[in-house]
Amino acid sequence: KVCKHMGERIQFDVVKDGDNRTILGCPVTFFDIGSTKAKQFGFTMQLKSGKKFTCVGDEPYNEVDYKYVKGSDWLLHEAFCLFGEADKFKPYEKHHSTVKEACQLAEELGVPNLLLYHTEETHLAERKKLYTEEGQQYYHGNLYVPDDLETFEI
C-alpha cells in the first residue's frame, strides 16, 4: 500500500552532515547527531515565518550539534518517559531521554517552544497531562505534548 508511493510522494535522499536541501520551499540543513548505535541525522529548517525549527533526531541532544540547535525557536525532542519511571522503561539503554532531561535542555538553550515526541505508550490517555506537569517543573517556555495525529500551526 505504501510502496506504491515510493519515488512519488515518498522520496529518499541520502544526506551527509551539513548537507542542505529545500523542502516545502524552506531551507533545511541536516546534521549527524553523533549516535553511537547507528548513523542518524537531525535537521534544522528555516520556516517561511523566519522561525527556526530543529529536530535533534531519535536520540538525546548531543553537544556536537550545538551550532545547528542554537537560536532555534522550536525544538522537537524525543522524551521516552517520565523521569520518575526511568527505572521501569530504561530510556538510556535505548539511547533515549526523559521528559525532565529534554525540558532541562530546552530551558538551558533558551528555546521558546519545545515539542516532545517518541514516548512510551502505557500512559496514552493521560500522557499530555503527565508529561506537561513534569516538563513545566524544568522548562518555562511553551511546552507541547501532542496526542497521536494531533496537528497545530507553528
Q: What positions do the PLM features span?
A:
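Cap/insert and terminal regions of metallo-dependent hydrolase folds
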Residues: 60-149
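Binuclear metal-dependent hydrolase catalytic cores
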Residues: 1-54, 60, 65, 129-154
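Structural beta-sheet core signal
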Residues: 54-55, 116
